[in-house]
Design a protein with these regions (language model features):
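Feature of multi-pass inner-membrane transport and sensor proteins
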Residues: 1-13, 47, 54, 197, ...
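A hydrophobic alpha-helix feature that marks transmembrane segments and, especially
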Residues: 32-36, 269-296
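Juxtamembrane alpha-helical signal-transduction segment immediately C-terminal to a transmembrane helix
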Residues: 38, 42, 46, 264, ...
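N-terminal Sec/SRP start-transfer signal
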Residues: 1-33, 263
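Loop-to-transmembrane-helix entry motif
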Residues: 14-18, 26, 49, 258-261, ...
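Hydrophobic, regular-secondary-structure patches
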Residues: 32-111, 121, 135, 239-241, ...
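Hydrophobic secondary-structure segments that place a key small or acidic residue at a functional site
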Residues: 106-117, 125-210
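Mechanotransmission and gating elements of multispan inner-membrane complexes involved in transport
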Residues: 169-174, 180-269
Length: 296
């Protein structure tokens, strides 16, 4: 009598126990599959949003915080940097492209991002309706923003101060929706894009008490950060060092910070995979999880 015959007789002699064992096994395998698939989707989304960005320059602080705020829009930025300093970097011979980013307001929790048309082009953004902004206080909505807020081309809305819901509204400087972007499965879907001048107009008008204050604010304009693409691969070695040592800004490499972030996100999934390999006694050679360590 072989093992299959014994298993068959056992299952028929104790059907409830057999069903429960199969159910537990199915739940375990299903949970493991869900964890691995979710991790893979998160990793793909993170890698897609960082594509085309060699370095992010912003205020000194945590490099990971700068990447989370400037690339993924999941954190608060360390601070602002002077526009004059950014323009000096734009003229640097190792900089092929510099995209300014200004944050500070939101609508229904979705961030309003002041930038240039090069930013949506970075992710291959296209319009589902309307047109790109042509003047200050015109805004283009991401697909998720339009779906959640119900705003359409021609509608007006006021930005709320801060990067989360609950700030005071800039009711005297409303935005006009000029376009709605098509879904791109990128960070663009959950952003409101406008000209960088719009962010300056809103906050300078809100802060200035007279013409002298307004002129002073305009002379000392700032942005939140800059996304930079190198003109040569060699810049990856020298440019961040130059920014970190010779300026009051910091340069953070998205590729390096992304690897750190993925290591943190992988901790739970790796534990589940290693437990499964150990539980079922599968050899390490059968493990497709690239952890670099034995699974048992």
């Amino acid at each position: 009598m072989n093992v299959f015959t014994l298993s068959w007789h056992y299952a028929w002699s104790k059907p409830l126990s057999a069903v429960l064992n199969v159910l537990v096994l199915a739940l375990g395998l299903g949970s493991l599959a869900v964890i691995l698939m979710a991790h893979q989707r998160v990793q793909q989304a993170l890698e897609r949003d960082v594509a085309g960005i060699d370095v992010v320059v912003g205020a000194k602080g945590s490099p990971l915080q700068l990447i989370l705020a400037g690339v993924y829009h999941l954190d608060v930025p360390p601070g602002n940097i002077a526009l004059a300093d950014v323009e000096a970097l734009r003229r640097h011979p190792q900089v092929a492209q510099l995209i300014p980013i200004s944050l500070g307001d939101n609508v229904n929790g979705f961030r309003i991002v002041g930038t240039t048309p090069a930013y949506p082009a970075l992710y291959g953004g296209t319009l589902a309706s309307g047109q790109w902004w042509q003047a200050p206080m015109q805004a283009v909505l991401g697909a998720d923003v339009a779906k959640t807020t119900g705003l359409r081309v021609g509608d007006r809305f006021a930005g709320l101060h801060g990067l989360g819901a609950g700030g005071h509204a800039h009711g005297d400087q409303p935005y006009v929706v000029s376009g709605v972007m098509a879904a791109s499965q990128s960070v663009l879907d959950r952003l409101v894009l406008t000209g960088i001048e719009s962010v300056w107009v809103v906050h300078e008008t809100d802060m200035a008490t007279d013409a002298d204050d307004l002129a002073a604010l305009q002379a000392e304009r700032e942005i939140t950060l800059a996304l930079i693409r190198y003109s040569t691969p060699l810049a990856a070695v020298t440019f961040p060092r130059h920014v970190n040592a010779a300026t009051n800004m910091q340069a953070a490499a998205p590729a390096y910070e992304l690897s750190r972030l993925l290591r943190m996100l992988s901790a739970g999934a790796m534990c589940c995979v290693r437990w499964a390999w150990r539980w079922w006694g599968w050899p390490h050679s059968a493990c497709s999880w690239r952890c670099g360590r034995p699974c048992a």
